């Protein structure tokens, strides 16, 4: 059985036992979070409008971290204007425990 869940403005296909990196959630490591289900798949597919009523995905927060550094540059020709800035996107790592519904 699998489910499509939405968190952080993105959609993910999840199954029990899967480790997943999502946009940073406001939850402590070791806590459990419930994610809304957009679609349930398996023997019979159930599509939500927009979410499947009575269905949820239970996940455990494994920890928080920061992604790889990306560099952003600004440049304007002929005026010696150059700027370089780095960014590391924060994330939360989840372990999918079960799919209810």
Swiss-Prot record:
Family recorded in the similarity comment: Belongs to the bacterial ribosomal protein bL21 family.
Pfam assignment, any one: Ribosomal_L21p
One cellular-component annotation, GO: ribosome
Subunit structure: Part of the 50S ribosomal subunit. Contacts protein L20.
Keywords from the named record: Ribonucleoprotein, Ribosomal protein, RNA-binding, rRNA-binding
Function: This protein binds to 23S rRNA in the presence of protein L20.
Keyword presence, RNA-binding: yes
NCBIfam families per UniProt: L21 (TIGR00061)
Keyword RNA-binding: yes
GO MF annotation terms: rRNA binding; structural constituent of ribosome
Cross-referenced InterPro entries: bL21-like, bL21-like_sf, Ribosomal_bL21
Protein name, per record: Large ribosomal subunit protein bL21
GO biological process: translation
């Amino acid at each position: 059985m699998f489910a499509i869940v939405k968190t952080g403005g993105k959609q993910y296909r999840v199954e029990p036992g899967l480790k997943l990196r999502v946009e940073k959630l406001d939850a402590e490591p070791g806590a459990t979070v419930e994610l809304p289900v957009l679609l349930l798949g398996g023997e019979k597919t159930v599509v939500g409008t927009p979410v499947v009523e009575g269905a949820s995905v239970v996940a455990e927060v494994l920890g928080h971290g920061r992604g790889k550094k990306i560099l952003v540059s600004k440049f304007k020709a002929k005026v010696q204007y150059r700027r370089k800035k780095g960014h590391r996107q924060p994330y939360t790592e989840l372990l999918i425990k079960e799919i209810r519904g």
